[in-house]
């Protein structure tokens, strides 16, 4: 999966701010010769005394530099959507200006120039805005069979309507659905727009921007519930071979270090301890732990008539 990283608005500031005034673009305007952008008022005032770009010194025009600048609506929309509250504050400043200066003729300007455009008309969504949404169960079989009048009535009855802040994420909505419907943790919930699953880090504002929600109704969301996939533990064959080789080498070293008088522990009949732990080497003269307790088998495989002799510290000892 691709890892998604969030970046801060300060990292984008060099692309969103005017070098002439040091603020965010307002009425972004671009020079067509070099594609550098500025605020409209800033670049118009600058070109009154200069014919060169303030960033790269490219000549804008020999005699009339204002002919080679263009309004950049796309860049301005990006700035308004990325910077919280910028559009609302700018519209308020314009309304206040024309209220304090009624003599200024603004009849020829647009509604945006006069500050009479609301966030809804501009499709600008703020973090603290309340968004209405509808949530319903996603039934792929019903979509394949087609919608009848009865199914449409059922869908209307199964819809639930919520009012949530625009900054709420899909993860919060999933947690709300799980707690509301008592869905056990063995099932996973997917929130969807139409038939496309949504990422957990998407906010309602992101969904509205990505899928161009027009505010002509509640934001339509769906959800589905399905069992969680269990993760299977995969053992690599290489590890098994290494373990087998390791056990063989251990058993070989044990045989090499054993005294000559001690009989071999290998036997054609399996002992109970070997049935319990088949992967470990078994020694009949050593008590084996079973279920955390040490047990000594009374009936050993090998019955010694005499006590064996073993070399201890280079000397032979025997007990009668």
From Swiss-Prot:
Lineage summary: Eukaryota, Metazoa, Chordata, Craniata, Vertebrata
A Pfam family recorded for this sequence: zf-C3HC4_2
Function: Component of a Polycomb group (PcG) multiprotein PRC1-like complex, a complex class required to maintain the transcriptionally repressive state of many genes, including Hox genes, throughout development. PcG PRC1 complex acts via chromatin remodeling and modification of histones; it mediates monoubiquitination of histone H2A 'Lys-119', rendering chromatin heritably changed in its expressibility. In the PRC1 complex, it is required to stimulate the E3 ubiquitin-protein ligase activity of rnf2.
Oligomer and partners: Component of a PRC1-like complex. Homodimer. Interacts with cbx2.
Compartments, record wording: Nucleus
Top-level taxon of origin: Eukaryota
GO terms, biological process: cerebellum development; chromatin remodeling; hematopoietic stem cell migration; negative regulation of gene expression, epigenetic; negative regulation of transcription by RNA polymerase II; primitive hemopoiesis
Record field: compositional bias (Low complexity): 262-281
Region of interest: Disordered: 234-320
Polar residues bias locations: 285-304
Protein name as annotated: Polycomb complex protein BMI-1-A
